[in-house]
Amino acid sequence: MKVRASVKKLCRNCKIIRREGVVRVICSAEPRHKQRQG
């Protein structure tokens, strides 16, 4: 998982979600696209 100041969708399968006040990107197609804002 990447921790970034600015999270962006990296492909069309990426979804931006907010979990417990933390913005995250989850991706079903490419697990390397997982990100967390921090």
From Swiss-Prot:
Parts of the chain that traverse the membrane: none
GO cellular component: cytoplasm; ribonucleoprotein complex; ribosome
Source organism, top-level taxon: Bacteria
GO molecular function, one term: structural constituent of ribosome
Database matches in InterPro entries: Ribosomal_bL36 (IPR000473), Ribosomal_bL36_sp (IPR035977)
One GO BP annotation of this record: translation
Pfam families assigned to the protein according to its UniProt record, in alphabetical order: Ribosomal_L36
Alphabetical UniProt keywords: Ribonucleoprotein, Ribosomal protein
Family designation: Belongs to the bacterial ribosomal protein bL36 family.
Record-linked HAMAP family: Ribosomal_bL36
Name the record gives this protein: Large ribosomal subunit protein bL36
